[in-house]
Amino acid sequence: MNTLLLSINWNPNPELFNLFGISIRYYGLLWAVGIFFAYIIVHYQFRDKKIDEKKFDPLFFYCFFGILIGARLGHCLFYDPGQYLTSGKGFVEMLLPIKFLAGGGWKFTGYEGLASHGGTLGLMIALWLYCRKTKLHYMDVVDMIAVATPITACFIRLANLMNSEIIGNPTNVPWAFVFERVDMLPRHPGQLYEAIAYLILFFIMIYLYKNYSKKLHRGFFFGLCLAYIFTFRFFIEFVKQNQEAFEDNMMFNMGQWLSVPFIIIGFYFMFFYDRKKVAKK
């Protein structure tokens, strides 16, 4: 049987609509929806733990810029340092959302290339700075962020799906997607696999928070978030297309190697860190 008949042809217009010459894209909208849900969830936890809400206001400023800067630097340094570190123009393109044109001048492109591992590191550093300023315990804050992270990650992967990016390897499974903007081969919808996995983790987090948060030690939610997401990320990479050509000859690709430290850290915080104490309520 022709596997194309069993595949889902995928070629959505990434632009939702155009408003006064400004392109509103699914990618940005889904990112915004994910951040909105995280905002609601973390705000609820602040109120539940009776933390001064004045300390909540600057939190998402730190989170946004920590993730953005970390994700951008992570992509440039981990995946394509030759492009961004060998010329002045490349260095500027790493820092600013522009691209220099061959004939001169430049154009606004947004940040083309963001790495989740770098975003995670950037977020952790930003939260450390936030906690120094607000005098909140670092692990209490990262636990709250961890509860909300999976739903944001889910919407980010749906955004990748709408952009037909981070595609999977060719396959003949009946739920394969044909990403027509790339080629006509049926492929694993890796973005959808990740989105579903993160949605499941989100429901697990909410269940544990509502029913067991007073019994779980400080750092548990942070550890579970890291261990679950990056363990899944490690294994899903086997059915995803490598992002850069240099990864083709590696036993494990860059995403898998970068996931290993986060997995180890995650299990440490789940099973060994501060087990005799429960999180501040």
UniProtKB/Swiss-Prot annotation:
One of its GO terms (molecular function) is phosphatidylglycerol-prolipoprotein diacylglyceryl transferase activity. It is a multi-pass membrane protein. It is found in: Cell inner membrane. Keywords: Cell inner membrane, Cell membrane, Membrane, Transferase, Transmembrane, Transmembrane helix. The keyword Disulfide bond does not apply. One of its GO terms (biological process) is lipoprotein biosynthetic process. Its main location: membrane. Its EC number is 2.5.1.145. A 1,2-diacyl-sn-glycero-3-phospho-(1'-sn-glycerol) binds at R157. It is an enzyme of class 2 (transferase). The chain crosses the membrane at residues 26-46, 59-79, 110-130, 136-156, 189-209, 219-239, 252-272. Pathway: Protein modification; lipoprotein biosynthesis (diacylglyceryl transfer). One of its GO terms (cellular component) is plasma membrane. Belongs to the Lgt family. PANTHER family: PHOSPHATIDYLGLYCEROL--PROLIPOPROTEIN DIACYLGLYCERYL TRANSFERASE, PROLIPOPROTEIN DIACYLGLYCERYL TRANSFERASE. Catalyzes the transfer of the diacylglyceryl group from phosphatidylglycerol to the sulfhydryl group of the N-terminal cysteine of a prolipoprotein, the first step in the formation of mature lipoproteins. This is Phosphatidylglycerol--prolipoprotein diacylglyceryl transferase. It comes from Bacteroides thetaiotaomicron (strain ATCC 29148 / DSM 2079 / JCM 5827 / CCUG 10774 / NCTC 10582 / VPI-5482 / E50).
